[in-house]
Amino acid sequence: MIESQVEIAARDGATTTFVVHPERGGPHPVILFFMDAPAIREELRDMARRLASSGYYVMLPNLYYRAGVMELGPIPPDPDHPARKQMFQLMNSLDIDLVMSDAEGLLAFASADPAADDSRVGTVGYCMSGRYAASLAARHPERVLAAASIYGTHLVTEAPDSPHRTAREGRAGSRTDPVTEAA
């Protein structure tokens, strides 16, 4: 595996992005892997590595770069703990348009890297970023061939850019969750 942490130009500055892909056999399809609210941490890097080990060029951007935050550390369950409050403040500082502008920079970076096949793009978002994965697929249907929202939040809102309004297709379910089995 080839791993690097690079600064990628975005509209509002540079986002520190963890990039990982196989050493050989490229160019590799691109996956934009959007973080969850607790920010970049080793668990997410490990998940990116696992995706890359299946033949993908994975980009894990720091969405909190505007605030100068890279990692938050452990988030205690206490809702009044300062670390949890900071996490929610950072999470609420983002919106679909901001993250889509970041994605433009990420896709431009991938286009310039011979290890990446930017004609085949997928995206995955966890929790707060599920909406970003769905929105990126809706905004770039010719380029983003698959999107996954894993326990995504804010997928259906009253906002005009709500992912449920812009998605071409949506599927939900779980083999083991009785709630989604019934749906």
Region spans (language model):
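N-terminal cap/leader regions of alpha/beta-hydrolase-fold enzymes
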Residues: 1-183
